[in-house]
A protein has these predicted regions:
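Cleavable N-terminal export/targeting peptides
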Residues: 1-32
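Transmembrane beta-barrel domains of Gram-negative outer membranes and organellar outer membranes
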Residues: 22-165, 169-256
Length: 256
């Protein structure tokens, strides 16, 4: 079975498993919120314009499943095609699994969710060939998802990434603190949402080097359970990110 077959088979399995748990309102927009209690699965394609004239095509499936009204399990699997090593290479790149415990809170009188959890990141590719990350890591996280009104979501989040197994080809271990600021606005007149996601990183193995990437996402639900979105990532030309110049992508989202 090829990679697209694997991804679509995985999506079908998740769609067929119908949970009895209630989902939050505006679930199409809330699925882009890491602190929201929703069940969904995305199938996504992204193109990355890398440094030195190289590029990368990434085929991904990402989603979340509520094991309990307060316990969320997320998944992400990536397959890439890249010429960053000088020739075309294809492989599975990385698997991510994340468990998040959600607690309803109301600081300053604002409806919110406290999110505490941890993420496991498993390298599946080859770092030398550009198809792998070169490290297996764990990443505890803490964040608050703010809901000031029915149309806006604001998420403040921080993770610490620590590699416990590193490829010999990689110069440094992973020791990174990653603050994140997300704004999501529901667009009921369009049946969709807009998301701005600023992802920052402080590399403690590289003289506390600060890096950042901005993701802009616009999506629309075409039915209560199916939607789609497009996204743009801005890299070093705008925000001094060294990983890539820019990235564009699109996805199908299934709520279940």
């Amino acid at each position: 079975m090829n990679v697209l077959g694997i991804i679509f088979s995985s999506l079908a399995i998740f769609v067929l498993i119908r949970p009895a748990l209630a989902q939050e309102k505006n679930s199409g927009a809330a699925a882009s919120d890491p602190t929201a209690a929703v069940n969904y699965q995305d199938v996504r394609y992204r193109y990355f314009d890398l440094d030195r004239g190289a590029d990368k095509h990434s085929f991904q499936t990402e989603g979340a499943y509520m094991l309990h009204p307060r316990l969320k399990l997320t998944n992400e699997l990536r397959y890439v095609n890249t010429d960053s090593s000088g020739k075309s290479e294809q492989d599975f790149e990385e698997l991510k699994l994340k468990g998040i415990h959600l607690t309803n809170i109301k600081p300053f009188g604002i409806k919110a969710k406290l999110a505490l959890g941890a993420e496991w990141l498993k390298d599946l590719g080859d770092f030398d060939k550009g198809t792998g990350t070169g490290a297996d890591s764990i990443a505890p996280l803490a964040g608050i998802g703010w809901v000031p009104d029915d149309r806006n979501f604001i998420i403040t989040l921080v993770q610490y990434f620590y590699s416990y197994d590193t490829d010999n080809a990689r110069d440094e271990d992973v020791r990174e603190t990653a603050p994140r600021l997300i704004w999501i606005r529901s667009l009921p007149e369009l049946g969709g949402w807009f998301k701005a996601d600023l992802k920052m990183s402080i590399d403690h193995e590289d003289d506390e080097n600060f890096d950042q990437v901005l993701e802009l996402q616009l999506g629309k639900m075409v039915s209560p359970s199916v939607g789609f979105y497009g996204e743009v990532f801005l890299g070093d030309d705008v925000l001094d990110s060294n990983a890539y110049n820019y990235s564009v992508g699109g996805a199908v989202r299934v709520m279940y």
